[in-house]
Amino acid sequence: MDMASLISSLLVLFLIFQNSCYCFRSPLSVFKRYEESTRSLSNDCLGTTRPVMSPGSSDYTLDIRMPGVTPTESDTYLCKSYRLPVDDEAYVVDYRPHANMDTAHHMLLFGCNVPSSTDDYWDCSAGTCNDKSSIMYAWAKNAPPTKLPEGVGFQVGGKSGSRYFVLQVHYGDVKAFQDKHKDCTGVTVRITPEKQPLIAGIYLSMSLNTVVPPGQEVVNSDIACLYNRPTIHPFAYRVHTHQLGQVVSGFRVRHGKWTLIGRQSPQLPQAFYPVEHPLEISPGDIIATRCLFTGKGRMSATYIGGTAKDEMCNLYIMYYMDAAHATSYMTCVQTGNPKLFENIPEIANVPIPVSPDMMMMMMMGHGHHHTEAEAETNTALQQPKREEEEVLNQDVHLEEDTDWPGVNLKVGQVSGLALDPKNNLVIFHRGDHVWDENSFDRNFVYQQRGIGPIQESTILVVDPNTSKVLKSTGQNLFFLPHGLTIDRDGNYWVTDVALHQVFKVGAEKETPLLVLGRAFQPGSDRKHFCQPTDVAVDPITGNFFVADGYCNSRIMQFSPNGMFIMQWGEETSSNLPRPGQFRIPHSLTMISDQGQLCVADRENGRIQCFHAKTGEFVKQIKHQEFGREVFAVSYAPGGVLYAVNGKPYYGDSTPVQGFMLNFSNGDILDTFIPARKNFEMPHDIAAGDDGTVYVGDAHANAVWKFSPSKAEHRSVKKAGIEVEEITETEIFETHMRSRPKTNESVGQQTQEKPSVVQESSAGVSFVLIITLLIIPVVVLIAIAIFIRWRKVRMYGGDIGHKSESSSGGILGKLRGKGSGGLNLGTFFATHKGYSRKGFDRLSTEGSDQEKDDDDDGSDSEEEYSAPPIPPVSSS
């Protein structure tokens, strides 16, 4: 009997170990199976996520589609990311949409480097990208394919291009999914590794604050921005509104002359149409857009928003420009000056007729079957979200570009910074001269004339990427440089506090084109300045403004040839400064599309804004975070104001830092400090259209470059402990109703792979465990019956008690009651890969950095490797 028990136990152990082999397969094999399952789209979708090579060409195509989704609510925005299959520089040269307006309201294709989520797809309300994103393609209303001109492409990959595509689809009416079908809307892009001489980009002009009153027959939404980047050549345009839009028109305004870029009804297929006539847009031109709406039939006001009941006013201009200084994406969101639009061509006010049949088809395709009462109630109760077409609600944080070598430039006290029309950084510094307590007497007369002017070049033109000095000027001309501004023609406008003068210096000239003020003579009349600090130039009129200054608390306006026009401002008379009072107006910036001039009122710790033409006070921006001083201010298109404050006074705790502000309401959007060195006296700030910001420090003798980065990876320190902010992750969890499978293509293979393995094992082992637990019981019962039958034959009825004991021993051991027996419940509950919840709890410590010892990482890259692209022929 002991021998029989031993054999039975060995048989059970064999079966159990066989069970573990079936249940807990190799993580490598499971992960391979997971990879294979993600290599193709849903069975309901045609196509593949892998690149498809073009026969006889180095080009390849990539299907970018939704992975078979079924929205459950109307006005759902879903996003999905796709990794560029190669890291090398490449170019998108063609788009082919796969979409139908009966299902999708519109779709957009973004380019970026850090998608907002690693999921297979996600709710776009959690964001599209965590870094700067650019629109590469847009589709709506059954628009036909877009064909790029020969030699033109959207740059992707490499050092400066996007590594990810993010597809966003707006699903309008959920009634289209009553049959529960799975949607695979998307676009096929054709990519070539061959370098394109011309780089494509998109200029987006859009309104953020248009209101369409109910019943009003004609409502105009006007947008205009001064263009100050290298020349672009528009070749296609696309318009976008919702139901109330009648026509959208875009123009180039040059020296008062309006030239049509494109005009179309937004109720027709929203494709990219060819521009009316070939033209170029150069620095100094104005890009103006008008959307014509009607409020007829509405019972309540209609606002800008992302739902079908809201409205939008968007004009996309697809352009190309020389690859040497290409910019892939630009925006304009400023409300147009009414005086400018008094001269808009009448054609912009004429709706484009759309046949009733076409209109009905569009309405049915959008699923706009809402009653007026529903529209009125929803408009009143819902705070409309802005559609992702706007690309403005990105959580952007500025961080120092630590790879930029410009911080180590050998310069003196940096007093002024600006960007020229070619987007080069221009630095105005004091060389070996220093402003200290011995520089002036009590009457503000400069005391160190005997040492002569600064002999080295005080104006340096620096490459914004490499910090290489491209050009230098300003030798033997200045004593104590201060402010710097560059106009649309590339002229330098500078001030010298020792000379008490303002200079206009040509970019290619050694001698000034214009000089205002009397050298070394401070004064307060119209022909004198007293330590003037800065200049701002109105790009439309050419008039310029002088902040004067350390000892005159005023702003002066002059004509382009230097004739005095007007002045305003007075010295602060109390601890509660009134509007228009200054205590060192230290820095100026033009808000040209608003017709405003903003002043950094340094010692009053605030920013004041005025109507440029009249000097009338508009508003002030003041925050406790500013502390007691605001040194400089700079405006960038898109409604963002940048500023830097001063070092805290003794006993104050306000840090010296940079600020990113919402110009419309003055709110602080972000603060930033350098990673290398420290701010000592940040004296000037310059902001580019692409979100890049430069700060010059007069005490640290340094210039820093700050670039936008993903805000959710920003860390804050509390009591010396660094804490990672995960707000954005929490938002993902809140918005997602059902978590789709994880998409490994966003670089999270190491972190997510164990989870995939365990889930797969758990799914396989459940059925096997139940089955294999039954089999040994049946086998053991059969063995027990066989043994009993043998003993009955050998010993007859006397063995009844022994057989009961033996049988109880075997079954008792199986039940875990016998001492030294095998407890199956304990065995499975403690075996690797199994727990009461189906799998072991994963370690959360260090999972982002470390791999399993058993995995060398080689296999985890299979999913992302693309077939090698044939080299470009040298012929």
Swiss-Prot record:
Residues 850-864 have a biased composition (Acidic residues). CDD domains: NHL_PAL_like. Its cofactor is Zn(2+); Cu(2+). It comes from the Eukaryota. Cu(2+) B binds at H240, H242, M312. Cu(2+) A binds at H105, H106, H170. Residues 735-755, 837-875 are annotated as: Disordered. GO terms for molecular function: copper ion binding; peptidylamidoglycolate lyase activity; peptidylglycine monooxygenase activity. A protein binds at R430, Y550, R602. One of its GO terms (biological process) is peptide metabolic process. It is found in: Cytoplasmic vesicle, Secretory vesicle membrane. SUPFAM superfamilies: NHL repeat, PHM/PNGase F. It is a single-pass membrane protein. Bifunctional enzyme that catalyzes amidation of the C-terminus of proteins. Alpha-amidation is present at the C-terminus of many endocrine hormones and neuropeptides and is required for their activity. C-terminal amidation also takes place in response to protein fragmentation triggered by oxidative stress, promoting degradation of amidated protein fragments by the proteasome. Alpha-amidation involves two sequential reactions, both of which are catalyzed by separate catalytic domains of the enzyme. This is Peptidyl-glycine alpha-amidating monooxygenase B. It comes from Xenopus laevis.
